[in-house]
């Protein structure tokens, strides 16, 4: 399947407004340029960029309000951060990324698509205070460590929206060894046995 056919398949499966699609196209076009000079997306993954990467990020929108302020940890190639920013133009997304080349791409995509978003270059654990009611991260860290990274927001009442793969239950069990939290596991629309974990009311077990 070509990238064009993959885009058509994504659009057939999701309700995307014309304005949002324009922003998404600008993001993906920018990624296409940058991937030629940076290791952002592998060549074997590109033909499924829409159904695999955009689609996997798109399903998080079911749990993120239109006006949400959100922080995305370890944003990399912009999934889900750029996709959420493209779809939630009334909110704001702050993406935290430590690699300079990736930050340069993220800023270029934000400018090209005119997104309500910003990039903080640095390690997540050294990030300054950032307003956020929601926290996302995709393929960033196992859940126990992810909760450590996200704790500055989660412990103040933010909601975690984390896509997880087939071993999510093992990660959940491990995370409960040092964190108390309420959660909901929603089956992923990306196929397989992955889920979207919605995590609230987070507190360290020894607090």
Curated annotation (Swiss-Prot):
The keyword 4Fe-4S does not apply. It comes from the Bacteria. Belongs to the methyltransferase superfamily. RNA methyltransferase RsmG family. It is an enzyme of class 2 (transferase). This is Ribosomal RNA small subunit methyltransferase G. Keywords: Cytoplasm, Methyltransferase, rRNA processing, S-adenosyl-L-methionine, Transferase. It comes from Hyphomonas neptunium (strain ATCC 15444). The keyword Metal-binding does not apply. The gene is rsmG. It is found in: Cytoplasm. InterPro entries: rRNA_ssu_MeTfrase_G (IPR003682), SAM-dependent_MTases_sf (IPR029063).
């Amino acid at each position: 399947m070509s990238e064009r056919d993959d885009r058509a398949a994504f659009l057939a499966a999701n309700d995307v407004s014309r304005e949002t699609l324009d922003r998404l196209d600008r993001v993906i076009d920018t990624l296409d340029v940058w991937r030629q000079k940076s290791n952002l997306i592998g060549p074997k993954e590109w033909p499924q960029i829409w159904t695999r990467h955009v689609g996997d990020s798109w399903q998080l929108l079911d749990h993120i309000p239109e006006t949400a302020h959100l922080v995305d940890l370890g944003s990399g190639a912009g999934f889900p951060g750029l996709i959420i920013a493209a779809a939630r133009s009334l909110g704001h997304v702050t993406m935290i990324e430590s690699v300079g080349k990736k930050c340069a791409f993220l800023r270029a995509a934000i400018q090209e698509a005119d997104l309500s978003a910003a990039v903080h270059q640095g390690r997540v654990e050294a990030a300054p205070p950032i307003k956020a009611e929601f926290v996302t991260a995709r393929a960033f860290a196992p859940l126990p460590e992810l909760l450590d990274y996200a704790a500055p927001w989660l412990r103040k009442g933010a909601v975690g929206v984390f896509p997880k793969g087939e071993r999510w239950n093992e990660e959940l069990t491990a995370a409960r060894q040092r964190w108390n939290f309420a959660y909901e596991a929603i089956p992923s629309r990306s196929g397989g046995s992955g889920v979207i974990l919605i995590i609230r009311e987070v507190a360290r077990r020894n607090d």
